[in-house]
């Protein structure tokens, strides 16, 4: 899956499933990405086995997606 497709998948979940967990392990542009979040709080974010930790109560969807993009650039 491409980076754009992956971010679209996350945006869709944020819009349509605000009170549900998102838990996935995907291949994004050749990188293994593990992500678990609820609302705008990231429980787990890993890229190729490197753990980027958790972040709580990220204020906006734009900032939330920016954190994920920053990890994808690793």
Identify what each model region corresponds to.
Residues 21-65:
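Acidic, low-complexity, intrinsically disordered interaction modules
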Residues 7, 11-15, 62-65, 69-72:
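Residue-level detector of alpha-helical secondary structure
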Residues 2-26:
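Negatively charged, low-complexity tracts enriched in Asp/Glu with abundant Ser/Thr
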Residues 18, 32, 74:
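Functionally constrained cores in energy, signaling, and assembly domains
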Residues 5, 12, 36-37, 51, ...:
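Intrinsically disordered, low-complexity N-terminal regions enriched in serine/proline/glycine
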